[in-house]
Design a protein with these regions (language model features):
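An N-terminal assembly and electron-transfer interface module characteristic of large anaerobic redox
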Residues: 1-295
């Protein structure tokens, strides 16, 4: 049985359930790196180049931690999931950067997910990964279908139940009990909010103080997309709705304040942050921007 390593960083928080189902249905054993700690962070910082943002450095650290634990590494290159909407260049280039900066890594499986190239290219990329494990096209088709169903179930649980990715992955289907009516929206990409080491446990700390915390994942993708379009029109950045859409949605529905967290040096986030801050000032909603790096 082939053991596949999945780094617990970046797109793990959006797609891990689907990846796990897909790989296991193909007969692979999935191993996930441990939650981020000082050792993982230091390993990633040592491998990252100067202009690499904190989340990508953390990702490299997770790959290093998995080197001796798996036969292959799963690092998709997610380029685009919608028309003329693109991912950050560093996330697009993750597989190539990982190969260059971590030469001791086992082989990297890097399907290109680029909806701009059409459905045929997407299928060819996914089936190319599947052929690494099986030559049975029916087994591969079932794995794809079950992975997609798992992804829909995962997103539905978070928005319907009002729970976080960590709760959904751990099958804790009830939101944290918090009688407080004081509500703070914590707006950030999941790989920042739910990595408790680099976020300094921001969400648990707020909940400990009796604050009701709401996040982008607790809103349906359709509502986030609609809110994004109301504020800026057609989105151009992949996952733009996690920042702009969530900010607009929660400002419209009513929160007592917003904490918006980003990685220092992130170009796309710096533009999105400015838009949300401007909108919050218009509506007189308190907003606290936090910028994170490895120092």
């Amino acid at each position: 049985m082939v053991t596949v390593g999945i780094p617990r960083a970046l797109l793990y928080y959006q797609y891990y359930p689907a990846w796990k189902v897909f790989l296991e249905k193909l007969g692979a054993k999935v191993v996930v790196s441990a939650p981020t700690n000082k050792s993982i962070l230091n390993s990633g910082v040592a491998r990252g180049v100067q202009d690499t943002c904190l989340p990508v450095k953390v990702f490299f650290g997770h790959i290093v931690s998995l080197v001796d634990k798996c036969d292959v590494m799963f690092v998709p290159a997610v380029t685009s999931l919608g028309k003329k909407s693109y991912n950050c260049s560093k996330l697009i280039g993750l597989p190539n950067m990982a190969r260059a900066l971590i030469p001791e890594s086992p082989p990297i499986l890097a399907p290109e997910i680029n909806c701009e190239k059409g459905r045929y290219n997407l299928y060819r990329s996914i089936y190319g990964v599947g052929r690494y494990f099986t030559s049975n096209p029916f087994k591969l088709k079932r794995a794809v279908e079950e992975a997609w169903a798992s992804n829909l179930d995962y997103r539905g649980k978070m928005s319907d139940e009002g729970i976080t990715p960590l709760q959904a992955i751990d099958c804790k289907l009830s939101p944290d009990v918090n009688p407080s009516s004081f509500t703070i929206a914590v707006i950030a990409h999941p790989y920042i909010s739910y990595d408790e080491y680099i976020s300094h446990r921001l969400i648990p700390q707020l909940q400990k103080k009796g604050v009701k915390v709401v996040t982008p994942e607790m809103v349906s993708p359709e509502e986030l997309d609609a809110a994004t379009r109301r504020l800026v029109g057609v989105p151009h950045w992949l996952f733009e709705s996690e920042i702009i859409g969530a900010g607009e949605y929660y400002m419209e529905t009513g929160v007592d304040g917003i904490i918006i967290t980003s990685a220092f040096g992130c170009g796309p986030d710096s533009m999105m942050l400015g838009m949300v801050q401007h909108r919050a000032r218009e509506l007189s909603i308190p907003i606290l921007p936090l910028s994170l790096d490895e120092h």
